[in-house]
């Protein structure tokens, strides 16, 4: 019995630790881990199958193979625990020690660790300052290295010099034997490492760093300094990179399993260890035999190779292979990659108490319920049932309980019912792309074998019932059940965390039913009746006196919320009013929760409207009411859809009568363009662009005509007049309500299919004029197949890409958690409505909703405060702000948050998934990553929905005013008047604004270069008026001066080519690509100069630079040599490439490249300073552009000749303005315009991609990612801190260090912001565990080990890996409580120690008194 009690005492308590340190193990350390040396390569005896003594599975070293039993069987049972058998030497203990006891191999010759040799940059090379090539030659016995020059003359030989065999012999002959020491192999390298004096090296490098000026040297020194300093601080000795002892993994971690038929399955590691032991033993023998040097050398080399293979097979040379010719899996492979230790077993484990089954719809369930098959429940809840059976005394032992459950007696089912009540279970559907992919439900027991799922949660799970499967998990502990219920219950997760929209929105049939019931129709049965209340309406409807859609008047009582603080019915005040409505709406209004007005439902309920309805309900009536309301909507919807009995017939696809005419007109126009092309008025490219445009427009027209005919129908009203009303056509109703299908799809059914794209994305210029109702001919069908096939191929490829993007995003943000309420930041960003092309893309309300404002928001007229400083802006505030016409609001943002190693709640604002201010402990980083990653996958899976039908945006060619007001131009707008008196824009960044009578900006439009302005500044503008027009298909080059054109370098066949159109015979001059020219003319650039009547150059106003207009490649010259040119005349046209269809296929890589912060290929060049432009001396292929700033300093840019320069001589440019066209480089934006501009750029660009697909993501998620991309800074001047110039450090770390230095009155470090791509940012995190589990495991671990890094376990990932609660949510408070408790314990211990000390210092008599008082014996 005592032994049993001792056994219980043995259980190890939880070890509390706060950091994990990684380092290199010294030989002594390895020996201290070991339980004995492995001397033999044998594993087990072939006859007895028992482990061989001193072999790889030796029981003496690693422990017994059976619990409490020695190998020879002399000692068995618990009572001999801890005894070491004198016969076989095995300790009697648990067999599981074979999982933790290590052995070791004493190597006969030192061996270099391959990771420190070959992982780039080579750490050995760095420390020794030798090249990898040289070190390898020494290690693999091809060369000698000088360890000690000895007595050789000064300068003849230095430490670390490499010598070949011949040189060595020559030198030995020259200086005599034993004068100097040079060794081959790892011993030489080890001796070199031992002789390094690190402190002295560090001092000399620091001195060199200060002295040198070259960037390359600074970089090299800084790298080496970092490594050496790490050795200094971590106490790791460099020579430990060379191993003298090799640790042996515990045998249970490299098992040897007998298979049927007498064969064995074994881990590859055993093979690798065996080779090492064999070669090591052979080497020992050779050394004892004093074998010739060359043989020993070969054996040493083979030993080195064997150890290399064990550690990282295939890293150097050919990989070692087993009997079946496949490379063996080494220790390194065990930990890296998807199937390695980190990702396979630590970050995601298989879970017990789980099951999976097919899902079916459960329309009768409540939102928080799911149907669980009885058999499944019985299996999952077994332990609970056993427990209950025992407490009730039905079964006496667990074994009896098991029998009872297996026989499935009636009592078991009763107990199951009881156990399951209010015990939430979790359902998960793969792929789990966001946090709504796992939700908790209360199980209802059902017959059958399929799980029933509530229809409203399908949107969150992205589930449908075509065979999807879901997994069930059971939270076991009380805490787990509590968290599942409060945080994960489906009825507590009704909003999408990505955008704050409701996730429990009905779809498909339900929407159709609700829509059908809330439509109204003219002259319906019983139209014009008046009802006293809703009960009367129901009675009349059931009696068949009215139809659902009839227009009637009903007296309705609504309840308004008057007191938000009150409880129950006291919150509401009723008010009764007669409404003109339809029967269906009146009946439906019965399910509205109190506090919602009838107006909300008094309209046809389309999908968007229903979403708005649920959203309003959530904001006004709270969560509970909303969930009940959603459930009722669902029930009503299903019932109404059934009653409506909507069906589809082929006659419902009405082909518009005007289709023939539209297509004929389009064909005529196309023929017209063909003619123009024949006669040479347009180029083939222009003709193609126009043809595609014509057919695009024709398709839209047919679509519009079809929708007009489909959506309206003429009926007689009750006075006998013919009126138009919305049609009750089934297909139209489905699309209009948002239940199924879209206008684009109906267009393919009944309009025309339109333009199709080729597999490469270019548009085929002959459209499919037929639709599916008419049927396609063979050619049309063939053209369609491209799109369909491309869609499927895309889907397969994109799913993987999108998943990878999500993984990178999660990894970069995983440690970002809200850790405090308020950081006290006073800076933020000023939000305006997002306007593009004159249209408001995102209204101000959407951008500021759920953020915290900075400063009071005041009434524009009365100046009274309407929203005080530091308020979270909710719907009411935002509506008020919009109503007052305030058009910009300053709000706090994640990017300006001052919290270190986390965020504060105020800067983040509203938690979109819950609707209030974010809680401390919320893992906002992961939520952001999921919100951005999830639609990526969704969209990619949806590329093919419009089967390649070329859904391309029509090219804008003019600006129309959307509102009334006065026209203003921005300060950057420059205009010239041409000979016809038109105003031609010659600025690149000009904008037209429309302001209202109060001077508030209503809209803003970018006006491109070369556009014609139709109105003068300050002119009154009416909505719908055109402000400017331009040719969208070519870009002009416009003369700003008058004169006579004189061509320079415009030589046919040299710089320009005559393009004679084969068909028309007309010719134009086109500038040809420099690459296609002869060598002599490569650097020459065709230029048009302007000269006046006297033959002198026309000068640029205010300068002495002549006007010369450079022509870029592809420009078509429209003037002739010697022609008189007026101001504003077009000198040349540059055709714009045809558009490829855009679809998220382009989008996903675009998002990835933004987050990876890649510099685009032909990036725009931005002005680095504000100043005046001039052109310097040209080089061979480049032109030199000089910007002279106000202080007269010149900044030079070299720009390739073929690039279009947007500025000209004498122009003044502002810092950050574009000088050469191209996509912007985010790194430039950061350095020239700062963090705020960069964030705006990335947010806008990412949002553009998602918006194109109609996906809503809140800006703050993208800002969170940007914050993580900016989390490192580069030190430019270390001041008095411990950093090195050019070192990249964590921003929070630098701030902490600076605070410390400033507190001591010294100089803080100066730094530059650095933008890192998400992969780079993940790998450069301070936590090596997180980085190693992400990518490049070997490199990360090698670096961490050399540096002796410590991981403070701050992020989520590190904690998951070591098996702890994550420091977020409940885990954060748990951890804080533990910290407080530990601090308290420490303080208490100190207090007690202090008191004891004080007592010890007191006089002796008092001490005696104290003892007498307490009645205890004197401790002495």
Swiss-Prot record:
**Entry binding sites for Zn(2+) 1:** 70, 72, 85, 88
Assembly information from the UniProt record:
The RNAP catalytic core consists of 2 alpha, 1 beta, 1 beta' and 1 omega subunit. When a sigma factor is associated with the core the holoenzyme is formed, which can initiate transcription.
Which coenzyme or cofactor does it need?
Mg(2+); Zn(2+)
Whose protein is this, by species?
A: Polynucleobacter necessarius subsp. necessarius (strain STIR1)
Q: Which SUPFAM superfamilies match?
A: beta and beta-prime subunits of DNA dependent RNA-polymerase
Residues annotated to bind Zn(2+) 2: 823, 897, 904, 907
Q: Output the Pfam families linked to this UniProt entry.
A: RNA_pol_Rpb1_1, RNA_pol_Rpb1_2, RNA_pol_Rpb1_3, RNA_pol_Rpb1_4, RNA_pol_Rpb1_5
Q: Which HAMAP family match?
A: RNApol_bact_RpoC
EC number(s) per UniProt?
Answer: 2.7.7.6
Q: Which reaction does it catalyse?
A: RNA(n) + a ribonucleoside 5'-triphosphate = RNA(n+1) + diphosphate
Name this protein carries in UniProt: DNA-directed RNA polymerase subunit beta'
* Residues annotated for Mg(2+) binding in this entry: 464, 466, 468
């Amino acid at each position: 019995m005592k032994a049993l009690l001792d056994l219980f005492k043995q259980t190890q308590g939880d070890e509390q630790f706060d950091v994990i340190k990684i380092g290199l193990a010294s030989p002594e350390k390895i020996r201290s881990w070991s339980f004995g040396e492995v001397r033999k390569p044998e594993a087990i005896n072939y006859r007895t199958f028992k482990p061989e003594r001193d072999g790889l599975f030796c029981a003496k070293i690693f422990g017994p193979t059976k619990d409490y039993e020695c190998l020879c069987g002399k000692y068995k049972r618990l009572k001999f625990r801890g005894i070491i058998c004198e016969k076989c030497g095995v300790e009697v203990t648990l067999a599981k020690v074979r999982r933790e006891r290590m052995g070791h191999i004493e190597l006969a010759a030192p061996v270099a660790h391959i990771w420190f040799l070959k992982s780039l940059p080579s750490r050995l090379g760095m420390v020794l300052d030798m090249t990898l090539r040289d070190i390898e030659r020494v290690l693999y016995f091809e060369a000698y290295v000088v360890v000690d020059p000895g007595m050789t003359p000064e300068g003849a030989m230095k430490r670390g010099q490499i010598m070949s065999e011949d040189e060595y012999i020559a030198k030995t002959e020259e200086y005599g034997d034993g004068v100097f020491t040079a060794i081959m192999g790892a011993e030489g390298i080890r001796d070199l490492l031992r002789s390094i004096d690190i402190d002295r090296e560090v001092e000399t490098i620091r001195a060199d760093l200060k002295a040198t000026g070259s960037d390359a040297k600074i970089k090299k020194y800084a790298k080496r300094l970092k490594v050496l300093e790490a050795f200094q601080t971590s106490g790791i000795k460099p020579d430990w990179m060379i191993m003298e002892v090799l640790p042996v993994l515990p045998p249970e971690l490299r098992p040897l399993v007998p298979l049927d038929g007498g064969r064995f399955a074994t881990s590859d590691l055993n093979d690798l260890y065996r080779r090492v032991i064999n070669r090591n033993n052979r080497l020992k023998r050779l050394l004892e035999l004093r074998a010739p040097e060359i043989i020993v050398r070969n054996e040493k080399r083979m030993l080195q190779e064997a150890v290399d293979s064990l550690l990282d097979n295939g890293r150097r040379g050919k990989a070692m292979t087993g009997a079946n010719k496949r490379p063996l899996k080494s220790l390194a492979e065990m930990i890296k990659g998807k199937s390695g230790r980190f990702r396979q077993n630590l970050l995601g484990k298989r879970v017990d108490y789980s099951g999976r089954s097919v899902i079916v719809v459960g329309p009768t369930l409540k939102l928080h319920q799911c149907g669980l098959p009885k058999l499944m429940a019985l299996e999952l809840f077994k332990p609970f049932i056993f427990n209950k059976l025992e407490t009730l005394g039905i079964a006496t032992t667990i074994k009896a309980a098991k029998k009872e459950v297996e026989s499935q007696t009636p009592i078991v089912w009763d107990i199951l019912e009881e156990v399951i009540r209010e015990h939430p279970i979790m359902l998960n559907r793969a792929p789990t792309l966001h946090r709504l992919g796992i939700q908790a439900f209360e199980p209802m027991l059902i017959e059958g074998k399929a799980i029933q799922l509530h229809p409203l949660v399908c949107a969150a799970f992205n589930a449908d019932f075509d065979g999807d499967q879901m997994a069930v998990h059971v939270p076991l502990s009380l805490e787990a059940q509590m968290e599942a219920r409060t945080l994960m219950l489906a009825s507590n997760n009704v909003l999408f965390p990505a955008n704050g929209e409701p996730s429990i929105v009905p779809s498909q049939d339900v929407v159709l039913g609700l829509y059908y019931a809330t439509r109204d129709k003219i002259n319906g049965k019983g139209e014009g009746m008046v009802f006293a209340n809703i009960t009367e309406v129901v009675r009349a409807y059931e009696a068949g006196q009215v139809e659902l859609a009839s227009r009637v008047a009903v007296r309705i009582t609504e309840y308004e919320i008057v007191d938000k603080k009150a409880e129950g019915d006291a919150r509401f005040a009723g008010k009764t009013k007669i409404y003109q409505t339809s029967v269906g709406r009146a009946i439906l209004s019965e399910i509205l929760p109190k506090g919602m007005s009838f107006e909300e439902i008094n309209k046809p309920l389309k999908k968007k409207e229903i979403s708005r309805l649920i959203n309003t309900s959530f904001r006004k009536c709270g969560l509970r009411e909303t969930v009940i309301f959603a459930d009722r909507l669902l029930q009503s919807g299903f019932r109404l859809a059934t009653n409506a009995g909507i069906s589809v017939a082929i006659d419902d696809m009405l082909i518009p009568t005007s289709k023939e005419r539209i297509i004929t007109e389009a064909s005529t126009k196309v023929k017209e363009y063909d003619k123009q092309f024949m006669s040479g008025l347009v180029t083939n490219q222009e003709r193609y662009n126009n043809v595609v445009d014509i057919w695009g427009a024709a398709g839209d027209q047919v679509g519009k005509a079809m929708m007009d005919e489909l959506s309206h129908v003429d009926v007689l009203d009750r006075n006998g007049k013919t009126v138009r009303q919305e049609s009750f056509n089934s297909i139209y109703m489905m699309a209009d309500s948002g239940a199924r299908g879209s206008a684009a799809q109906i267009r393919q059914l009944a309009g025309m299919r339109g333009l199709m794209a080729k597999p490469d994305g270019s548009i085929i210029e002959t459209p499919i004029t037929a639709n599916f109702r008419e049927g396609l001919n063979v050619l049309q069908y063939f053209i369609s197949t491209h799109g369909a096939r491309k869609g499927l191929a895309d889907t397969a490829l994109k799913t993987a890409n999108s998943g990878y993007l999500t993984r990178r995003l999660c990894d970069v943000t995983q440690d970002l958690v809200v850790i405090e309420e308020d950081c006290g930041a006073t800076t933020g960003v000023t939000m305006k409505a997002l306007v593009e092309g004159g249209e408001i893309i995102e209204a101000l309300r959407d951008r500021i909703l759920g953020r915290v404002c900075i400063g009071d928001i005041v009434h524009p007229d009365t100046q009274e405060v309407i929203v005080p400083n530091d308020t979270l802006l909710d719907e009411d505030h935002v509506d008020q702000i919009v109503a007052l016409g305030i058009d910009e609001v300053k709000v706090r943002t994640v990017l300006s948050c001052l919290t270190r190693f986390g965020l504060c709640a105020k800067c983040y604002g509203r938690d979109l998934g819950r609707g209030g201010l974010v809680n401390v402990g919320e893992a906002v980083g992961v939520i952001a990553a999921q919100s951005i990653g999830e639609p990526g996958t969704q969209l990619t899976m949806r590329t093919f929905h419009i089967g390649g039908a070329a859904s391309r945006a029509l090219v804008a060619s003019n600006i129309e005013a959307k509102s009334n007001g006065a026209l203003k131009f921005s300060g950057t707008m420059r205009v010239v008047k041409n000979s016809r008196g038109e105003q031609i824009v010659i600025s690149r960044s000009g904008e037209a604004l429309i302001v209202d009578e109060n001077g508030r900006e209503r809209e803003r439009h970018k006006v491109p270069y070369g556009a014609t302005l139709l109105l003068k500044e300050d002119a009154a503008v009416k909505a719908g008026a055109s402000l400017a027009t331009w040719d969208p298909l070519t870009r002009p080059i416009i003369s700003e001066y008058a004169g006579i054109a004189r061509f320079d370098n415009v030589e046919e066949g040299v710089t320009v080519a005559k393009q004679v159109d084969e068909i028309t015979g007309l010719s134009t001059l086109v500038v040809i690509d420099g690459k296609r020219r002869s060598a002599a003319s490569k650097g020459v650039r065709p230029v048009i100069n302007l000269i006046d009547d006297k033959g002198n150059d026309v000068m640029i106003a205010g300068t002495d630079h002549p006007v010369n207009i450079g022509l870029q490649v592809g420009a078509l010259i429209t003037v002739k040599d010697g022609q008189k040119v007026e101001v504003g005349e077009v000198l040349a046209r540059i055709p714009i490439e045809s558009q490829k269809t855009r679809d998220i296929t382009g989008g996903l890589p675009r998002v990835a490249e933004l987050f990876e912060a890649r510099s685009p290929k032909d990036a725009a060049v931005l002005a680095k300073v504000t100043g005046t432009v001039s052109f310097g001396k040209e080089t061979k292929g480049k032109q030199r552009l000089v910007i002279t700033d106000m202080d007269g300093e010149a900044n030079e840019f070299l720009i390739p000749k073929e690039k279009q320069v947007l500025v000209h001589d004498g122009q003044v440019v502002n810092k950050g303005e574009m000088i050469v066209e191209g996509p912007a480089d985010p790194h430039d934006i950061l350095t020239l315009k700062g963090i705020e501009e960069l964030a705006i750029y990335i947010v806008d660009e990412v949002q553009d991609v998602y918006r194109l697909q109609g996906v809503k993501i809140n800006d703050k998620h993208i800002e969170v990612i940007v914050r993580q991309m900016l989390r490192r800074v580069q030190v430019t001047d270390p001041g008095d801190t411990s950093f090195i110039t050019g070192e990249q450090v964590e921003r929070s770390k630098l701030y902490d260090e600076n605070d410390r230095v400033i507190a001591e009155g010294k100089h803080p470090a100066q730094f530059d912001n650095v933008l890192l791509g998400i992969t780079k940012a993940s790998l450069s995190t301070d936590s090596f565990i997180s980085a190693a589990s992400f990518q490049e495991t070997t490199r990360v671990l090698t670096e961490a080990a050399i540096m002796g890094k410590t991981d403070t376990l701050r992020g989520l990932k590190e904690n998951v890996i070591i098996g702890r609660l994550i420091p977020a949510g409940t885990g954060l408070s748990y951890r804080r409580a533990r910290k407080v408790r530990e601090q308290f314990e420490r303080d208490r211990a100190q207090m007690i120690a202090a008191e004891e000390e004080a007592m010890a210092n007191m006089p002796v008599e008092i001490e005696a008194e104290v003892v007498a008082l307490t009645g205890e014996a004197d401790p002495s």
